[in-house]
Regions:
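Subset-of-secretome marker
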Residues: 22-176
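C-terminal motif of bacterial Sec signal peptides marking the signal peptidase cleavage site
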Residues: 5-8
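Bacterial signal peptide processing site
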Residues: 10-12
Length: 176
């Protein structure tokens, strides 16, 4: 009877150890999963609804954990009446050249394009549609300097970066 009690106690200890080991394994795996999520680079593309004037914006946000890495805003919009008249007189190709020449003479655009991490591209997609693509690479862009430039000061880059990317995305989706 005495031997039986010892064997019973020994088995009970082993069962307790096995449960503790399983629990330790599970707990040690959780930080790995959390760290993997923090180290994952995520890219999300938001296609916002068309506005009343026919403009449509697409935003591509790339981030890692709570840090924005880049933002690309693509804006497609109908051409203005003034631009339509110019296109009718000169054609799409010549109008595209004239748009680029105008940008090359615009001091605010010239100043903004000098910033590392900022890109601006304007394309005349057709006789009726214009596309502007603005890209911000936050890994190299001097946001403070960018926010002071005439061309970029009303975009609110500093406020954008105060948000967590996931909150910015959910706000954009909620507000269109």
């Amino acid at each position: 009877a005495f031997l039986f009690v010892l064997v019973g106690c020994g088995q009970k200890k082993e069962t307790g150890k096995a449960t503790k080991t399983e629990k330790d394994t599970l707990q040690s795996a959780l930080p790995v999963i959390e760290n993997a999520e923090k180290n994952t680079v995520v890219t999300k593309t938001l296609v916002l609804p068309k506005s009343d004037d026919g403009s449509q914006q697409t935003q591509t946000i790339t981030y890692k954990d709570k840090t924005f890495l880049s933002l690309t805003i693509q804006q497609k919009r109908p051409v203005s009446d003034e631009l339509k008249t110019y296109i009718d007189q000169h054609g799409v190709e010549e109008t595209q050249k004239a748009l680029l020449e105008a940008e090359e003479k615009d001091e605010a655009i010239i100043e903004a394009r000098k910033l590392a991490g900022f890109k601006l591209e304007t394309k005349l997609l057709s006789a009726t549609e214009l596309q502007t693509t603005t890209s911000f690479d936050f890994q190299v862009l001097d946001v403070k300097k960018a926010s002071q430039l005439e061309y970029l000061k009303n975009i609110g880059l500093e406020n954008l970066l105060k948000n967590e990317p996931s909150k910015y995305i959910s706000d954009r989706l909620a507000n269109g």
